[in-house]
């Protein structure tokens, strides 16, 4: 459900009603006039909201599930079951992490296996890649 809500507030989701919304299709509005107002659906005060940064955090850390922790990156996706997976690149402590998540069982949540540079990791935490410039991470979702 998180992705469903995330998609609903995404500015691009309003492209089909852009004539009503009337603000840039790529920014979050500070407010959208409600159904009691004569100009229902009209967006106002674009660029004055901190919503973009919060939505970035929600999307990357809680939907894609790539979170920085003290000892490394925690990989814990919560994605729509219809997704086959996704790829992401994340810089963390000067190291570039190339992350591939596959979802063969089409689950919403749960990690079956994490492989780091070809070796199976314990749990969902990818330890910091000290002394490396790049790290390859493969995550298989499942129970």
Show which residues each predicted segment covers.
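Non-catalytic C-terminal accessory modules of carbohydrate-active enzymes
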Residues: 1-143
């Amino acid at each position: 459900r998180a992705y469903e809500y995330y998609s609903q507030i995404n500015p691009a989701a309003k492209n089909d009603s852009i004539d009503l919304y009337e603000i840039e299709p790529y920014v979050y509005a500070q407010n959208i006039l409600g159904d009691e107002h004569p100009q229902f659906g009209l967006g106002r005060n674009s660029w004055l909201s901190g919503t973009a940064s919060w939505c970035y955090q929600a999307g990357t850390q809680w939907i894609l599930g790539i979170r920085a922790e003290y000892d490394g990156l925690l990989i814990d996706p919560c994605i729509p079951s219809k997704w086959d997976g996704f790829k992401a690149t994340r810089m963390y402590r000067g190291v570039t992490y190339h992350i591939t998540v596959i979802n063969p069982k089409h689950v919403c949540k749960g990690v079956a296996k994490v492989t780091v540079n070809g070796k199976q990791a314990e749990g969902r935490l990818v330890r910091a890649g000290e002394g490396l410039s790049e790290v390859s991470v493969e995550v298989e979702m499942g129970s």
